[in-house]
UniProtKB/Swiss-Prot annotation:
One of its GO terms (cellular component) is cytosol. The modification N-acetylmethionine is found at M1. Transmembrane segments: none annotated. This is Transcription initiation factor IIE subunit beta. The gene is GTF2E2. The keyword Protein biosynthesis does not apply. The lineage of its organism: Eukaryota, Metazoa, Chordata, Craniata, Vertebrata. Residues 1-63, 243-272 are annotated as: Disordered. Tetramer of two alpha and two beta chains. Interacts with FACT subunit SUPT16H. Interacts with ATF7IP. Interacts with SND1. Part of TBP-based Pol II pre-initiation complex (PIC), in which Pol II core assembles with general transcription factors and other specific initiation factors including GTF2E1, GTF2E2, GTF2F1, GTF2F2, TCEA1, ERCC2, ERCC3, GTF2H2, GTF2H3, GTF2H4, GTF2H5, GTF2A1, GTF2A2, GTF2B and TBP; this large multi-subunit PIC complex mediates DNA unwinding and targets Pol II core to the transcription start site where the first phosphodiester bond forms. It comes from Homo sapiens.
């Protein structure tokens, strides 16, 4: 063979080996690769949605609309309405509102007809913190107090009747702008802290202010009567020669009971026999007496 042809053949082989070759994939390999890609995308989407839900719960932005068909949604709307009516009452807005006005101000106009009917016929009507006035709804506090004078009268009535004080939280719930009113009353009221750290307001009766000896105060506080009832305390005082105010006071005279008159006895009536022979019979008693 011609040597020039051999050289050209070798060069052709070298060029063929240096050029890259792309092969076609089979159908089975293509389907497997596509399914694996789909699985990866699904996992990524699921993970992202789960992370979004977890982030929503962690941030506290829980949507009530997700529970629109459950009882939790209904009671959540009810709690929001009651809290809103309470806050507006404390601001001084005491005029009643219709249900549509309440739903508008609480941003719940998109609730269903069933939930709206439930609020109108059951939930708001039977709620102890809501009162119905001419088809409208208003907040109903524990005490009807509108100003500081009414608060002072209420505390005075509790003091005179021996009912004690009133919780500060009940006054804050009932009286609009309660902090200003309490501050304005000054020394006319007293504050007492309970063991559970709740504050109680009392009427400060200045006519009852007098000095008591410290020794007497110590003796008074040292006496424990927690485990004794009223009967045991009364028996102990009697043994010590101390009588109660009930015994020393005027005794009530028992009313005189009038005797009932005995009922008059009715004459007995005897049944007479042979009444049909009254005109035929004769009396022979005179003849027998003469013999």
């Amino acid at each position: 063979m011609d040597p020039s042809l051999l050289r050209e053949r070798e060069l052709f082989k070298k060029r063929a080996l240096s050029t890259p070759v792309v092969e076609k994939r089979s159908a089975s390999s293509e389907s497997s690769s596509s399914s694996s890609k789909k699985k990866k995308t699904k996992v990524e989407h699921g993970g992202s949605s789960g992370s979004k839900q977890n982030s929503d719960h962690s941030n506290g932005s829980f949507n009530l609309k997700a529970l629109s068909g459950s009882s939790g949604y209904k009671f959540g709307v009810l709690a929001k309405i009651v809290n809103y009516m309470k806050t507006r009452h404390q601001r001084g807005d005491t005029h009643p509102l219709t249900l549509d006005e309440i739903l508008d101000e609480t941003q719940h106009l998109d609730i269903g007809l069933k939930q709206k009917q439930w609020l109108m016929t059951e939930a708001l009507v039977n709620n102890p913190k809501i009162e119905v006035i001419d088809g409208k709804y208003a907040f109903k506090p524990k005490y009807n107090v509108r100003d500081k004078k009414a608060l002072l009268r209420l505390l005075d009535q509790h003091d005179q009747r021996g009912l004690g004080g009133i919780l500060l939280e009940d006054i804050e719930e009932a009286l609009p702008n309660s902090q200003k009113a309490v501050k304005a009353l000054g020394d006319q009221i007293l504050f007492v802290n309970r063991p559970d750290k709740k504050k109680i307001l009392f009427f400060n009766d200045k006519s009852c202010q007098f000095s008591v000896d410290e020794e007497f105060q110590k003796l008074w506080r040292s006496v424990t009567v927690d485990s004794m009832d009223e009967e045991k305390i009364e028996e102990y005082l009697k043994r010590q020669g101390i009588s109660s105010m009930q015994e020393s006071g005027p005794k009530k005279v028992a009313p005189i009971q009038r005797r009932k008159k005995p009922a008059s006895q009715k004459k007995r009536r005897f049944k007479t026999h042979n009444e049909h022979l009254a005109g035929v019979l004769k009396d022979y008693s005179d003849i027998t007496s003469s013999k």
